[in-house]
Structure formats: structure tokens, C-alpha cells
Amino acid sequence: MLENVRNLTAHDNGNTFKIIKEHLERLGYHVYAKVLNALDFGVPQKRERIIIVGFLEDVDFSFPDPIPESERKTLSDILEDTVDKKYYVRDAIRESRIERLKDKNYPKPYISHENMAGSITPHPYSSALRAGASANYILINDERRPTERELLRIQGFPDDYKIVVPYGKIKKQTGNSVAVPVIKAVAREMIAALKKFHEHGGNENGESSEIERFQTSHNADPIPAKCVS
């Protein structure tokens, strides 16, 4: 599985993606690709990324469907109840941003995003987190920065994920990360497709399946049935 920005398919008039796909196919992979949005998989972040999946076996694979809106986490769900004052911006910054806010009556909570032109737009979700882009300066309610835990939650990390580095590194790590629920959903469909392929006798020549090869190379335990339900 590979992940990249959604514009990969348009880069160099589509030639970059074409070369990647053709190279994977020459290596023997059956390739599937689709742009998925993290918003559709349960996190309050508009993060559109192309996911490229390859199989050495000719399996019948489909990308996962978006989850129901009722099951998606909202911004309210991921915000911490108590936040240290160090995350709050100076009054001058807050007042300046509110003055430039396009919709001054936008309901809270919201995340505002300052683009390259200095325009500030509120949304009920985060834009795609970035590793170090000052042009994507996000604030919650134009009052404070997201905490480390909130940044991780925006990417779908569980709360038992330990924070052992300072804020700047968490910001960089979450900006470089994939959205966990998206990758989990795709991986679940990959496992289901491979399982179905082999249950229907797709591997009749006696060779090891991709699942078996993965488990052997990683010394992994057999994949439990609940992973493909």
C-alpha cells in the first residue's frame, strides 16, 4: 500500500502516476488506486490522499466505503476539556484573526485556517495537517493551538498512543502521518479480498499466498477472523 497527495494523478499531466503504476505492474502487481478523504472515515480532518494498493495475485479488491455520518467523530469529540494556558495565543493575534475572519458568527467549536493570501476561513474540521507549513496556521476558535493529543486525535491515533517528544515534533509527525482510520479501513478490505481469493481456490498451484508470505516474513500470528468482518 502506498499513499501520496491527491494531485499525484495530475502531476506532469498524469505522467508521474502513469510511471509509478506501470513500474508496479512490471513487478507483477495488480494495481488499484483511489483518492480517499479522512473526513469520510471518522476523523474531523479534510485530508484527501491517493491510496495505491498492489497485489501479486489477481484478487477482486474494492476500496472501503465511507462510514455513516453518525459514526464520524466531530471536532467537539476530539477537543480536550482542560487546556493549559500555554496553548493560547496573544490577544493581539486573536483579535487580528477574528477581524479577518470571513464568517464572524460561525458556530463554535471551529478550526480556522490561514492560507497563503492571509485569508482566514472557519470550518467544523481541520484542513490537512502539515509538517511545517506556516501558511497553514490553524487555531481552535481563533484562541489557541491544538494540543499534542488533539493533533494525534485529528489523525485518528488512539489515546493510549504515548507522547514522548515535544510539541514541534508532534506537529511534524502528525503532519507527515497517514490518517490511521483510512489505512485501517483499506487494510481490512485488502485482507478480506485475499481471504476470499484463497477460500475460492484462487491459489491452486501450491504457492504460498500473500497473507502466508507476510506472516512468515514478519513472524506474525495468523490473522484473526474478526479482522476481516
Residue ranges with predicted function:
Residues M1-K46, I50-F55:
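Conserved Class I SAM-dependent methyltransferase catalytic core
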Residues H23-L27, V35, Q45-S229:
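S-adenosyl-L-methionine-dependent DNA methyltransferase catalytic core
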